[in-house]
Amino acid sequence: MLMKQIVLIVVFVSPHVLFSLSISFQVINMNVCIIGGTLEALLLAMHYQEKGTVSIFEIDAELGLPISHPGRVLNPSIFNEYFSPQQIEFLKLSSNPDGWGCRWEWVMKHMTSVAASKGVNIYPRTRVLSMEQLHDCIRVITTNNERHQPTQFDADLIISTHEESTKPGRLQHVLDESLTIPFKEQEHIPWFGGTLLTLHHPYPSMPKPALTLSRSDGQTEVWWKGECPWIPPAGYLETCSGTLSSLVDDLSFDAIVQRVSDFIHSLE
């Protein structure tokens, strides 16, 4: 059963903590737990599903919602590697100077469906309560949702793509940093995004956005770094806010795929 064993040592340094993490995991028949229902989590899960059993834990009812990422792809042909033509049609792609605009909520819905069809276990409305190092694995204890799912999982590898919420009273996963590998990205800053009708864009009074992404459904996303700098006279159809990389080049489907690939290679 065990064909080969790799010992991975990861060293993290922060202003408050310096520790080393030694994890031994199987190349095949691995049990992998991924914390956080992000696009990164889904891409990681589909990779590790080929090597064993993968479970994703997400506190919210649906992965990737509410949306907090621009609907943007630079090379739309990359979607062919993941989605059917019918699924791609739902994305409502349209070319812009800043890249191709797309409906990010459907990127997440489709990717969730694809991951589940490949055998990834996805547990929404599920919070990690504790972790414990056993002799040959890490035991993860979770809450139970209405599906009467298991609440105990044994893992060889735990990856966290979860970002701590800044909302007061928001439930959080309880993680042991010594037992998890964080999917670390670049330093994040606040971003604000708003959606308005393309026929109303651009407004003369609107400050220049960092990203402007029109879609073929007649709607346009505008994104700024920081807080909302402007509200259209009729208001936004939808607003998004969250923390993202300060680099616009990092904010695309293509860039996320590349970062996940780099992360996987760093563990091999």
Please identify what each model-predicted range represents.
Residues 122-233, 254:
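Predominantly flavin-linked oxidoreductase catalytic cores and closely associated redox partners
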